[in-house]
Amino acid sequence: MVTVFMVLFDELVRLKRVVFLSPYANFNLVFGLSLAKHLLKFLHSIYMFCEFDIPSSVLSILDESEIKRLYISKTVHNVNISNAEGVIMILDKEVNNMYRILRIDIKYLFIFIPRLKLIKDIHDLIIYRVRKASTGIYQFLTKERRYFVKVIGTQVIEVSIPHNLELIVVELNDIINTFGSIKASDFVKYCMHKMNLRREECVDLVRKAISMGIIKYRGGYLTLT
């Protein structure tokens, strides 16, 4: 039984064409197959191109009916995808496979890749950067949004973030984008005034964000991961 982070998956379906910059191979497999499971709720079939073998234990994310509608291959060569409804690619490096896919008009396209040298070549795709926040917890980052998921085995589980903690992250992000950095003590004072919280509450929120890997503390200064 897979618990799907529905908010993020629904957002990805709305965006349709997304690149995930993620160096985490196992995470890419589990999340990619969980995304395929979500897409197969309304698509007849999906093509998945994965450069390495997928363990049967990970394929257990899908039921028998879903597996029959998921076409898996290590390469796009000799595969007719001109009429494909959806494609998921899990790559360990930049290869011609990806650029061939980009030339085809595919409605739902999701690519997992560790890095991209030529981001301008994929200007029509939304880019999410995936960062490991703490053990089993990953962040999906864009300039505007930040999602959290937890992977346990083959399960993708929602990670809820307290509202005040989310506000702390937003405030720190705005300050860093404007000034570059801020002392931890100054940020606590700022949050006390801006959010009308007691000092102890602000300190606890900052510590919580640090423990989750959302905020980094170094030399008395705070930065985002």
What do these predicted ranges mean?
Residues 210-220:
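A short, conserved structural fragment
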Residues 21-25, 48-53, 88-95, 112-115:
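Structural motif
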Residues 222-225:
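Flexible loop/N-cap segments at domain edges
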Residues 160-192:
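Short amphipathic alpha-helical interface segments
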Residues 196-210:
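Short amphipathic alpha-helical interaction segments
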Residues 1-43, 48-50:
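Glycine-rich P-loop/Walker A and Walker A-like loops and their local beta1-loop-alpha1 context
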Residues 3-7, 51-98:
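A short, well-structured beta->alpha microelement
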